[in-house]
Amino acid sequence: MAGPAWRDAADVVVIGTGVAGLAAALAADRAGRSVVVLSKAAQTHVTATHYAQGGIAVVLPDNDDSVDAHVADTLAAGAGLCDPDAVYSIVADGYRAVTDLVGAGARLDESVPGRWALTREGGHSRRRIVHAGGDATGAEVQRALQDAAGMLDIRTGHVALRVLHDGTAVTGLLVVRPDGCGIISAPSVILATGGLGHLYSATTNPAGSTGDGIALGLWAGVAVSDLEFIQFHPTMLFAGRAGGRRPLITEAIRGEGAILVDRQGNSITAGVHPMGDLAPRDVVAAAIDARLKATGDPCVYLDARGIEGFASRFPTVTASCRAAGIDPVRQPIPVVPGAHYSCGGIVTDVYGQTELLGLYAAGEVARTGLHGANRLASNSLLEGLVVGGRAGKAAAAHAAAAGRSRATSSATWPEPISYTALDRGDLQRAMSRDASMYRAAAGLHRLCDSLSGAQVRDVACRRDFEDVALTLVAQSVTAAALARTESRGCHHRAEYPCTVPEQARSIVVRGADDANAVCVQALVAVC
């Protein structure tokens, strides 16, 4: 590369336009900093936030609930790997964050005028889930934040290729857009890139969930943790061998009384957990997987026929089912577990700060300590609002202290971008076969062999970068899964079916000297 095709500068650059990214950008803007928001997509609303159905877990001051109860439910779901202080900090700030969201224009469903309606989801001991549009909470959150961010500098079709730094602090970003590669100089960068669901052949995630932020963090030298804990949502709409993004069937349906049964009508979770169909997601998904293995059936069923007014309460699910030829009012809904959420990510504090000065992460890409080994339902939008807003404030404060001139002079043109990448279809098939809900040493080693066949590719566009990111993140997930020789939360090892108390520590992955490889620091405390 002879040099950048273009240059730009800002105080804060945010990568991502979901709940965490927009919350961060708005907070940084309110702090008086210049903000640039990047989206690799052509449309900014195509995010995991937009597709979120269930709601936001929040303790209301006038409800029969408490922050301590929400914290306890979160810790129980997290299977011993949550950071209790982080959990309390984020949960306790939830009501303030949701109130601010409503103040920005979000319209939540109400049980009576002036009182938010509440539902219950798996792992929660109380009805504490606020929602919008029945089962379109994410779409309403996305709409409200985008409307509020209408005056911000949001740029579509921009793919962040590398976080630039001087070894001590962030200096900017290398970005590719239709007119070529360029540099945005900035002292603060916030990664809010979402998840990694497209490691697998079928997922509830949108097309952009390709692990970009994890790869950017690894290349920047910061710690990534808990990547072996990939949550498979118990109820993804079954559609035969169809891959790509598949519709989610929200957990709130079970909260309103729907039951999970097999083809013979037998309960899936009876005798498995005291909370039955409302057990934490890892428990319910594992119970479904076990039943499918025992019966040889391709799916189980969510029977929601007893829910009065189903179509009006769950319009999104109703539309998805009817598009697939299923009437959920009259027929049980065929479901299977599907890749849904990364409980791990870039290690940050509860303000989104990473090890690298000026680099922040928020939302699904981050590991704050809230989720541990298994995320509690509807804690994701909560975390995005709370930590996204905090990260924006922190990034703005750092930018004010660092000053623009240092970042501008430090951001230099890098060498050509070339990494190794596996064919995406081959990678997804290998991950679905060997690193899905259940893992075994033989399969994980076979997966390592498959990943070692990745070929060098010059990164010149979004597709190239996504394939490179998926390959590096697949290596990271595989390495972490091999290192954890127990079953805990979302991570199940066939030859190690028990939870080992001595392994109640996080596994940290870092980028190796070779940018196409990773190394593992096994079982270290990162809380």
UniProtKB/Swiss-Prot annotation:
Where, per UniProt, does this protein localize?
Cytoplasm
Indicate yes or no for the key word Cytoplasm: yes
- Looking at the UniProt record, the site noted as Important in orienting the L-aspartate substrate sits at 121
Task: Name the needed cofactors.
Answer: FAD
Which residues does the annotation say bind FAD?
A: 17-20, 40, 48-55, 212, 364, 380-381
Q: What is its EC number?
A: 1.4.3.16
The pathway this protein participates in, as annotated, is: Cofactor biosynthesis; NAD(+) biosynthesis; iminoaspartate from L-aspartate (oxidase route): step 1/1
Instruction: Provide the GO biological process annotations.
Output: 'de novo' NAD biosynthetic process from L-aspartate
Q: What name does UniProt use for this protein?
A: L-aspartate oxidase
Tell me the lineage of the source organism. Answer: Bacteria, Bacillati, Actinomycetota, Actinomycetes, Mycobacteriales
